[in-house]
């Protein structure tokens, strides 16, 4: 199984990228993992236009057979253990998974329509780059839970 996080934007501040890279490296011990960054849309077309452009770019990166899981504030809120169980089910299916993170304006309706699942990383509103870090860390945590390793206590 391959897991990809497909996210809008880059961490220009350099604040989150080192931690995301570290967890991505750790994840490589457990599964095939890839972080795909797509460019943010220019706001010239307005919020709806930018969301639509970003949505089209996100969907272009998704394979026809990939399970699509979007991060959405209205998605399922899971504990780390419940998320690990969800990851286990994905692994049992043997289906590749694409986890999509929208930009600062959220996800386009077309992206939400394509989603097989919706997950929320928190009830808080998070910067989308911070949400990326939380998601990658939780993926790593899920793998350690599934393997019975001591990272999750």
Curated annotation (Swiss-Prot):
Keywords: Cytoplasm, Methyltransferase, rRNA processing, S-adenosyl-L-methionine, Transferase. The keyword Ribonucleoprotein does not apply. It catalyses: pseudouridine(1915) in 23S rRNA + S-adenosyl-L-methionine = N(3)-methylpseudouridine(1915) in 23S rRNA + S-adenosyl-L-homocysteine + H(+). It comes from the Bacteria. Its main location: cytoplasm. S-adenosyl-L-methionine binds at residues 71, 102. Its EC number is 2.1.1.177. InterPro entries: Alpha/beta_knot_MTases (IPR029028), RlmH-like (IPR003742), tRNA_m1G_MTases_N (IPR029026). It holds the Pfam family SPOUT_MTase. GO terms for molecular function: rRNA (pseudouridine-N3-)-methyltransferase activity. GO terms for cellular component: cytoplasm. NCBIfam families: PRK00103.1-4. Specifically methylates the pseudouridine at position 1915 (m3Psi1915) in 23S rRNA. Homodimer. This is Ribosomal RNA large subunit methyltransferase H. It comes from Anaeromyxobacter dehalogenans (strain 2CP-1 / ATCC BAA-258). The gene is rlmH.
């Amino acid at each position: 199984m391959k897991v990809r996080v497909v996210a809008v934007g880059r961490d220009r501040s350099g604040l989150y990228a080192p931690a995301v890279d570290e967890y991505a490296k750790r994840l490589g011990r457990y599964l095939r993992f890839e972080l795909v960054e797509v460019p943010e849309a220019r706001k010239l077309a307005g919020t709806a236009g930018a969301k639509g452009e970003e949505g089209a770019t996100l969907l272009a990166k998704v394979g026809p057979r990939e399970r699509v899981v979007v991060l959405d504030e209205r998605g399922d809120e899971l504990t780390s253990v419940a998320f690990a169980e969800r990851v286990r089910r994905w692994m049992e299916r043997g289906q590749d998974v694409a986890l999509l993170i929208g930009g600062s304006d959220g996800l386009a309706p077309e992206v939400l329509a394509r989603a097989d699942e919706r997950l929320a990383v928190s009830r808080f509103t998070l910067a989308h780059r911070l949400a990326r870090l939380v998601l990658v860390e939780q993926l790593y945590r899920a793998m350690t839970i599934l393997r019975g390793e001591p990272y999750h206590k």
